[in-house]
């Protein structure tokens, strides 16, 4: 199988020739990778199958000075106006919520929203998708959002997490205006990504904590379910075979039936410290594929290479072979030993071959 055939078979819960794999590196790990390998291409070096595309950078940045002028130690902000203050420790930053002082829907309407739907930013996307597909790779893309989030995360990055959760109860008109503004961008972006031919539509919001959800399941259903359902429906109407991927750290098992109902195909990352991957596979494996399952709170930073190999083999046996793309459950941070990264790749290669049915 080509990498694209392998990934699409696995994520459609069919039998691949071997288990596909993926991981991302934090900036310090990218530097270590370049130092050790002399390469700039992690995916090519480690034979990681997926490829990722996105829209072009803006040529018309907005002016957020009105929203950030009271932050003297601001380092930078993204195109949505979400500011960042360096922690002085690796890539970690403190976030500045540019809509933290908003009071009414008028404040949301007056905000200088980025030009993420401008046609010039989407012009190269179809060719980028075709390029990777013609080279045999599956293509994944996410609608543009603040700091890579979709609905909940983009909104709370702008507003502040605690404040947004308060708004859902105490200022529902403002919450509705903010959620609808962001979701309308997601809807149109999902349509364009489907039209461009991407194989996998990536959505994601961390709505889970270590033991439970960040909000009650009913609150999520009231405010987020229908909006995400519209995003997914638009993409599948344009491209019925598009696969929908949803990322949330933490334990979100209470809403898995809801996500399946609105069209989810792939759950990521299935944190083993929060949800048992084998149990999730037993309960939902006839309706969901899984991307992740290798713990980055346990195995990858604190295990040794033998432990990494053992866990990889266990996941293949209990969650695979159909419906599994093996990956660490988070970007690999500086605390992950290089030897464990190599062990992960080697273990998937060693144990990941799948015999024909």
Where in the sequence are the language-model features?
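N-acyltransferase acceptor-side catalytic subdomain
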Residues: 1, 33-35, 42-46, 79, ...
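Active-site loop segments of alpha/beta catalytic cores
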Residues: 1-26, 30-35, 77, 108-357
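Short, solvent-exposed loop/edge-beta patches enriched in aromatic
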Residues: 15, 46-51, 69-72, 133-136
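Segments that shape or occlude catalytic/ligand-binding pockets
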Residues: 30-69
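A contiguous, low-structure linker/loop signature
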Residues: 64-114, 135-138
């Amino acid at each position: 199988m080509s990498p694209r055939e392998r990934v699409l078979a696995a994520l459609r819960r069919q039998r691949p020739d071997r288990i596909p794999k993926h991981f991302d590196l934090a900036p310090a790990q990218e530097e270590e990778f370049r130092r050790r390998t002399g390469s700039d291409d992690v995916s090519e070096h480690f034979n990681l199958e997926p490829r990722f595309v996105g829209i072009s950078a803006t040529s018309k940045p907005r002016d957020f000075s009105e929203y950030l002028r009271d932050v003297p130690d601001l380092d930078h902000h993204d195109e949505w106006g979400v500011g960042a203050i360096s922690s002085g420790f690796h890539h970690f930053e403190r976030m500045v919520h540019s809509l933290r002082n908003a009071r009414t829907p008028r404040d949301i309407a007056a905000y200088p929203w980025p030009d993420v739907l401008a046609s010039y930013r989407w012009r190269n996307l179809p060719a980028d998708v075709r390029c990777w597909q013609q080279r045999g790779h599956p293509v994944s893309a996410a609608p543009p959002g603040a700091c890579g989030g979709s609905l909940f995360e983009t909104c709370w990055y702008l507003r502040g997490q605690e404040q947004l959760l308060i708004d859902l109860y105490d200022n529902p008109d403002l919450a509705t205006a903010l959620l609808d503004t962001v979701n309308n961008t997601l809807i149109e972006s999902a349509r364009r990504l489907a039209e461009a031919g991407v194989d996998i539509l990536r959505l994601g919001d961390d709505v889970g904590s270590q033991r439970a959800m960040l909000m009650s399941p009913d609150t999520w259903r009231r405010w987020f379910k229908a909006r995400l359902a519209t995003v997914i429906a638009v993409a599948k109407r344009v491209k019925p075979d598009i696969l929908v991927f949803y990322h949330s750290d933490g334990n979100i098992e209470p809403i898995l039936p809801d996500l399946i109902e609105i069209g989810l195909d792939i759950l990521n990352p299935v944190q083993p410290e929060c949800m048992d991957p084998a149990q999730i596979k037993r309960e939902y494996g006839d309706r969901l594929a899984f991307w992740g399952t290798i713990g980055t709170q346990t195995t990858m930073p604190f295990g040794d290479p033998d432990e990494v190999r053992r866990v990889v083999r266990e996941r293949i046996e209990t969650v695979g072979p159909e419906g599994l793309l093996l990956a660490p459950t988070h970007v690999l941070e500086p605390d992950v030993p290089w030897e464990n990264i190599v062990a992960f790749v080697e273990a998937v290669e060693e144990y990941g071959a799948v015999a024909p049915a």
